[in-house]
Amino acid sequence: MYSIPWEEFLPADAAFPVTGSSLNSQLTSIPACQSVIKKAVVKRLMKGHRTTVLPESGVEYKVRFMLRKNVCEIMLDTTGEGLHKRGYRRNAMEAPLRETLAATIADLGRVRRDSLVEDPFCGSGTLLIEAAQKAMNIAPGLKRRFAAERYSFVPASLWAEQRQKALAESKLDVGFEAFGYDIDPAAVALANANAKLAGVEKRCHFEVADVADFAAKQEAIVLTNPPYGERMSTIEGAAKPVSYTHLRA
């Protein structure tokens, strides 16, 4: 661990918490491993930066380790928040659908550039927004920031270059259209706000409507995550039978 040139990656004031896991390895104590790795990094940084003080008051560089079958991998967390955090959903309704799961559902639904997609339980709009971004080839995470953007050894110009490249590959003139409905006006307002933040507000349309009045448009792909008791974390709701037999498609 000491042999890694940490001083080439971490400045003298870097904060560097150590976290990790162990699987099928002789070293099973995570706290002990954290302590050993931390001490090795500290010793190397002190030597590399020629200092006896490491204030850890600067940018955070999360050090992660993974022990698997007695082989240790050391990593720097370049992402920060989970990749499902796209950067456009500042707020969400109760029991929101993860963006990554919504993107997978859009894939399974075979959403294309000219698709018409509807969601009768749109909530904060995640399913339709992810479907729109897929249809328009908008890179996921384009609106968010990553931990490595603050790392001193990664040129800021690299991030700007890649973002410009991703923007250039977006297809904004597609025929895709999405329509979302929800009985809750607050959810509809939130969906509209999220769509605007995601840059797909011209392709995603949301309005207040009761699912009892829903009838899918001809040729529409219906993607939805209907509310149910267990997901909403209510014992009463989970005990009730749920029926959406009145839906017309």
Predicted regions located by residue number:
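Conserved S-adenosyl-L-methionine
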Residues: L97-A215
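A short, flexible beta-alpha/helix-coil linker loop
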Residues: L23-Q26, G82, Y228-R231
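A short acidic, Gly/Pro-enriched loop at the edge of an enzyme's catalytic core
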Residues: A215-I221
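C-terminal edge-of-domain segments
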Residues: L67-I74
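SAM-dependent Rossmann-like transferase core, predominantly class I methyltransferases
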Residues: I74-L108
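Conserved small/polar residues in nucleotide/adenosyl-binding loops
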Residues: T245-A249
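Short, contiguous acidic/charged loop-to-helix segments that flank catalytic cores in large enzymes
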Residues: V211-A212, G229-P241
